[in-house]
Amino acid sequence: MTSSAFDSSRQGCGSGQCACRRAAQTRRADPFDDTDYGTPTRHADTDVTLDIDGRAIAVPAGTSVMRAAIEAGINVPKLCATDSLEPFGSCRLCLVEIEGRRGYPASCTTPVEAGMKVRTQSDRLQALRRNVMELYISDHPLDCLTCAANGDCELQDMAGAVGLREVRYGFDGKNHLSDAKDESNPYFSYDPSKCIVCNRCVRACEETQGTFALTIASRGFESRVAASAGEAFMDSECVSCGACVAACPTATLVEKSVARLGQPEHEIVTTCAYCGVGCALKAEMKGEQVVRMTPHKNGLANEGHACVKGRFAWGYATHKDRITKPMIREKITDAWREVSWDEAIGYAAARFRRIQDEHGRDSIGGITSSRCTNEETYLVQKLVRAAFGNNNVDTCARVCHSPTGYGLKTTLGESAGTQTFASVGSADVIVVIGANPTDGHPVFGSRLKRRVREGAQLIVVDPRRIDLVDGPHVKAVHHLQLRPGTNVALVNALAHVIVTEGLVDEAFVAERCEPQAFDVWRAFAARPENSPEATADIAGVPADAVRAAARLYATGGRAAIFYGLGVTEHAQGSTMVMGIANLAMATGNLGIEGAGVNPLRGQNNVQGSCDMGSFPHELPGYRHIGDAAVRARFDEAWSTTLQPEPGLRIPNMFDAALDGSFKGLYCQGEDIVQSDPNTQHVAAALASLDCLVVQDIFLNETAKYAHVFLPGATFLEKDGTFTNAERRISRVRRAMRPLSGYADWEVTLMLSRALGYDMHYAHPSEIMDEIARLTPTFAGVSYALLDELGSVQWPCNDAAPQGTPTMHVDQFVRGKGKFVITQYIASPEKVTPRYPLILTTGRILSQYNVGAQTRRTENVRWHGEDRLEIHPHDANDRGIRTGDWVGVASRAGQTVLRALVTERMQPGVVYTTFHFPESGANVITTDSSDWATNCPEYKVTAVQVAPVAQPSEWQRAYTRFRAEQLALLEQRTAERAPAIATGK
């Protein structure tokens, strides 16, 4: 969406009349309309009426003639035009006649005018179009019957549309029919012999993705699409988002899965199960088999775009490692035994009940998954509270965004972000703190880059030199490259400038915020120790840069902050979130389009798992378990008596397991061994349990310690909803039958029933209906509404029946905004002569979280191992070169990684990812955590790095344990084989 679709002034937006909201309302009219209108929609305050083929048609000013015609049901042939890209006018197929104008203008590049008279059909136009098509066909292979795009080819369709039945030009002259294919990319092929040089792929790479990896090389007849400097796609800057493939009107760029399986027969609109962007996708199917995944053009979170993971990395769903039958064993040293669902569920329930009989009601608990649906996480927390009879339930949000919930609820009154992703298109200043959107949230990252190319000014706060700092046609105005662990010192310095230089929005603060709290905060921020000069030595950021960034944020127009785990995963994570909220309130950057505070949540349903009451102290809707009135409402609905005391958090569960008071755990869709800090501590805790029940699709690192394995279902095998980082609730629709026979919600129902607490639901829609009855912010949510609108952002209730795109418009959820003192306290993780470097961790584009899904796809071609990034200065001091094996040691443990020497790092800081279990990234992270929420401090670990020649002791032990567990899994298969053979 271009900036012209938004009102860029600070006033007026938020009334419901701004262009961006009208756009949303227009698009919501039919969220499943897949028509390609040729050029993007335009929004204007006035309509223009024109005549097309004798019909009076009214459209917004600025609309192209092509779009006006197609919206009216008048077909105009086109090849270079598509409504996801700006008009280009190169194919000359969409020519029309306009009364009073000479020649035949291209309808895609011609805007409508009042009183204009247009003809789209005439003998002359038909002849011109046929001649254009003949020229295209004259240099195009005539292998339609065997072509992968047969039946889904715009060139083929347009040849029919213009009535082309024969070609006068032969293939005797020079042509491109023998040009070599590029098969280097694992997901799609490039066949230049079929290219018509329409530029759609190049424009998609530039406009939609913003990578600028493609170009048109040479001129005239020699023109061809080239990746970077004529490299193979796999060796180029291409990030395999698939935008070029989606844009291609021929078989020049085509998915290899389509070439292999043929054209899909039907499609199901669903929601991606990777990051927190929540892209709407179409699962294009042939029977029960996925042929391809394509971005849904009307998905409001992604607007027809996707990334390499959502677009292509879906093969894990049918990977050979999938476990589809329940398994049990007495001890973790025993071989697994495949059993029926009834036996597995009964075995798990009996062991849980025995534990509670021997060790008490609070000796067991559950962990929900941020990869499962809202309905499934709701059921797990309900099972724990009603069937287990305690509040020992937690979620992986504990180890990522729990400080977001605490910090935003304290200051603003709600545990969620304030904007839509689309509203970045009306931001004048964009601040990215502790996030790497181009890797972690790539579709939103592309939107952000587009807005920066349009003129928004970008501030990046990050220890690393991420792509946004200086990428293709995108450059940050300020990069505040702070030292890890000093976030709060820096945010206080920014606040100091805003307060002492008179940049506070006094009117906003007086009207919207608690005056006493603001006065106290203002005095705190103005203290000399919070000045940029005083904090420069702490954070490592020059005072002049801090002052310039603060001034830009406060005075540059609508300013939006987007932050990630680089904010939350710190000992002062909650403090930093509140510091960010302080900045937004002080400058009035809340409650309007293009401004706000937005956590970029990492997994597909982190927001939803929190919304559904997955924390030990909160019920669905973030209502405290200690509130008797709230408890009474749930007691009545659930026919039970809830306990008033908060239960154990995940770290507390581990500690209690090691001291013998916590003996059983139900873990759904979460690999805590690989993802939680201090792996040795986690593994020891799980090994001490009497019963660990894991529900997952693979035998992950946690499942290797399990006594019961309940096979899970992928997002393709279930119905439900996900809630993305912008509070958008979207439908997940089943595209194939669960390979195990049951969706995850059905398994939880069976376990609850076996425990003596029966829950009755025939479909996830009934679970959502119950959520709506019990949760005020979800009161208006239903599957019928989601099917009507496509998606909805909570709060959705009587006050906001179609959802709430922008939070805190007239007042904060808590009434008045609350400024909070954010005193900087140094991290307990300090560099010493023994551990002189700081390790910080994160993600990379091609992999996802612990990698269980992406490691089982071709994405390993881009990132097949975790590497340690280190600055040349630190590498030279240690005699380290790229590719060398290096030992990384902390006070918690040691592992060995391959080095990558890069100036993306600053001296004194090293970085790695955590996608591969054998890397042991969390062997070296420690127990240091956020003071308010226990969110681990993954971003600050003091380490030493040195060249080594062999794996670490932990890696050798891990390799042995993994081999033992896989052997026990194989024994299960070997033991069953004779019985199966005999049965046949």
Write out the residue ranges for each language-model feature:
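Short beta-alpha connecting loops at secondary-structure transitions
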Residues: D51, A114-T120, G230, V474-L482, ...
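Fe-S ferredoxin-like electron-transfer domains
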Residues: S4-A5, G12-G14, C18-G38, R92-S240, ...
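Long, low-complexity segments enriched in small/aliphatic residues
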Residues: L600, Q607-C610, F615, P764-E858
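Catalytic alpha/large subunits of respiratory electron-transfer oxidoreductases
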Residues: P141, C198, R203, A259-K718, ...
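Glycine/threonine-rich phosphate-binding loop and adjacent beta-strand/alpha-helix elements that clamp
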Residues: F421, E717-P738, V747-G756
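Long, contiguous, secondary-structure-rich segments that constitute the structural scaffold
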Residues: P738, Y742-V792, D798, E858-E869, ...
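N-terminal cofactor/phosphate-binding cores enriched in small/glycine residues
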Residues: I57-A114
